[in-house]
């Protein structure tokens, strides 16, 4: 079992401990449950989707990286597929607070990077901040996505974000989590570069058209992708590096163990991710950083 779960293990009920042990004891627990696993857990615990997601919040929150606030937030994104995806907040010492990732952003991005096509609900242990409400407004689920909180009645994103400003106000029809492939190609055939290529081809940038993607390789040799996810309100956009950091953290890797990275973006883009990416990776101890332009 990953050490991060050991700290909260005694806080879980004996029944939940027994149900989760076969999964969390896996060396590479992916911080998600498939629909089949969700159904098995519900049967064993005699609960429904909502109750299971709420029970899993402490486990998701244990994935938080909070060297600044020491305030752990967990989230569960529930896909139309029936899969459950963990999310947790992340902070990076030595980098600006603007690089912080919120738990809801983490869960949504985790689901997106794993190929989920639509979300039906987000369960989180604290009320979503305005930043996260706006971030979720970019989803193809729209304002109908359900928001679940401990001790609260279920509400929709529309309830939390009335009179919202979103993609439709800018006549954007391709939304976050819609399947896209921008068709970019590069000559670099290395595995890391090709993973970054996959990431940029999945990126969501309908406002600036400044597509970008990154791949990071860990000291363990594992590679993780991150795709840029733009937002109608601009500021809540998810940089590609943060998306990759979410992916590696959910997989149980340490953000300080990144060995190398390749960022791909368009040479003529209105925006660049390079400076912020380089600065944050440097703060995390990574020195082998390459930029490829299209």
Curated annotation (Swiss-Prot):
EC main group: hydrolase
Positions with a binding annotation for substrate: 89-91
Cofactor: Zn(2+)
UniProt keyword Zinc present: yes
Enzyme Commission code(s) on record: 3.5.4.5
Catalytic activity, reaction form: cytidine + H2O + H(+) = uridine + NH4(+); 2'-deoxycytidine + H2O + H(+) = 2'-deoxyuridine + NH4(+)
CDD domains, sorted: cytidine_deaminase (cd01283)
Gene Ontology MF terms in the entry: cytidine deaminase activity; identical protein binding; zinc ion binding
Pfam families hit by this protein: dCMP_cyt_deam_1, dCMP_cyt_deam_2
One GO term of the biological process aspect: cytidine deamination
Residue ranges of domain CMP/dCMP-type deaminase in the record: 48-168, 187-294
Cofactor: binding details: Binds 1 zinc ion.
Highest taxon listed in the record's lineage: Bacteria
Gene Ontology annotations for the cellular component aspect, listed alphabetically: cytosol
Keyword vocabulary terms for this entry: Hydrolase, Metal-binding, Zinc
Binding site for Zn(2+): 102, 129, 132
Active site: 104 (proton donor)
NCBIfam families according to UniProt: cyt_deam_dimer, PRK09027.1
Family that this chain belongs to: Belongs to the cytidine and deoxycytidylate deaminase family.
Summary of subunit composition and partner proteins: Homodimer.
Role: This enzyme scavenges exogenous and endogenous cytidine and 2'-deoxycytidine for UMP synthesis.
PANTHER family (alphabetical): CYTIDINE DEAMINASE
Record's protein name: Cytidine deaminase
């Amino acid at each position: 079992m990953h050490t991060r779960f050991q700290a909260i293990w005694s806080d879980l009920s004996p029944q939940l401990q027994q149900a989760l042990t076969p999964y969390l004891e896996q060396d590479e627990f992916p911080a998600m449950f498939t629909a089949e696993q969700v159904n098995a857990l519900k049967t064993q615990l005699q609960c429904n989707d909502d109750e299971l997601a709420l029970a899993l919040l402490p486990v998701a929150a244990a994935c938080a990286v909070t060297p600044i606030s020491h305030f752990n937030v967990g989230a569960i994104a529930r896909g139309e597929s029936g899969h459950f995806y963990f999310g947790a907040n992340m902070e990076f010492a030595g980098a600006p607070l603007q690089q912080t990732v919120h738990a809801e952003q983490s869960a949504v991005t985790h689901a997106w990077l794993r190929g989920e096509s639509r979300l039906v609900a987000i369960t989180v242990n604290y009320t979503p901040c305005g930043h996260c409400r706006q971030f979720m407004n970019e989803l193809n689920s729209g304002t109908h996505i359900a928001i679940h909180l401990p001790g609260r009645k279920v509400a929709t994103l529309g309830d939390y974000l009335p009179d919202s400003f979103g993609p439709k106000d800018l006549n954007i029809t391709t939304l976050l989590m819609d399947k896209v492939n921008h068709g970019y190609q590069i000559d670099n055939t290395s595995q890391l570069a090709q993973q970054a290529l996959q990431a940029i081809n999945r990126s969501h940038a309908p406002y600036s058209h400044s597509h970008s993607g990154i791949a990071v390789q860990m000291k363990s040799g594992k590679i993780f992708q991150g795709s840029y996810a733009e937002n109608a309100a601009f500021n809540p956009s998810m940089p590609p590096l943060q998306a990759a950091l979410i992916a590696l953290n959910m997989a149980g890797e340490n953000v300080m163990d990144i060995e190398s990275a390749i960022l791909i973006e368009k040479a003529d883009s209105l925006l660049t991710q390079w400076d912020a990416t380089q600065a944050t990776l440097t703060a995390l101890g990574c020195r082998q950083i390459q930029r490829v332009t299209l």
